[in-house]
Amino acid sequence: MKLFIYFFCLIVFLSSSICVVHSLEPYCVLKNRLNLINNLYVHFVQKINFCNMKEIELIRGELWIKRPNLFYCHVMGSQESFLISDGKTLWFYVPTIKQVTAYCLENIISNNVFLQLLFMSNTNIWQDYTITQKKDWFYFKSSYDDGKHIKQFKIKITDRGIIDQFSIIQENKQHIDYYLSNQCVNLINQDKFCFTLSDDIQLDDQRMKF
């Protein structure tokens, strides 16, 4: 589940935080490009590889994002699932077993270093990363090797706000790539990000278990 949150958080944080340090100029350029996006719909393909680059998992789906904190991800295929943020609760729903897990969005952020990095407007956190730009690619590399930081991540976004790809390299050398297509930035109705709990769905409520 957390793999889908990374992309969402990057857009939310970078689009809302403030550029205050000249040495972070590539970050400011990226922020300005992401500021072109208030609503986002894309098709995505997620590929997960280990260090030998052997593909181990391929996932397809659709993604809706509405700033500042609304998110709807539909994973297609035999393992269909939905990940929905209504701004307060993060719902993870698996229709084949009629079960939904509810998480407090704030708690998810506070218990994950990567999500703290992406949600909190704290320039000291960003100083833990070296940020560089090469054309439409923006690269983030951790200054630490402590297992607490995402080792590297990168995003490709044009000066028109079109996001093509987003990648993460974790400490265990796992490589996660997202390929995006059919991007649309039209207004998304707020109702899209609501989850209705019906009587036939089993609830696993984790909102108070942190």
UniProtKB/Swiss-Prot annotation:
Its main location: periplasm. GO terms for cellular component: outer membrane-bounded periplasmic space. It comes from the Bacteria. Residues 1-23 form the signal peptide. It is found in: Periplasm. The keyword Signal applies. Keywords: Chaperone, Periplasm, Protein transport, Signal, Transport. One of its GO terms (biological process) is lipoprotein transport. PANTHER family: OUTER-MEMBRANE LIPOPROTEIN CARRIER PROTEIN. Belongs to the LolA family. Participates in the translocation of lipoproteins from the inner membrane to the outer membrane. Only forms a complex with a lipoprotein if the residue after the N-terminal Cys is not an aspartate (The Asp acts as a targeting signal to indicate that the lipoprotein should stay in the inner membrane). Monomer. This is Outer-membrane lipoprotein carrier protein.
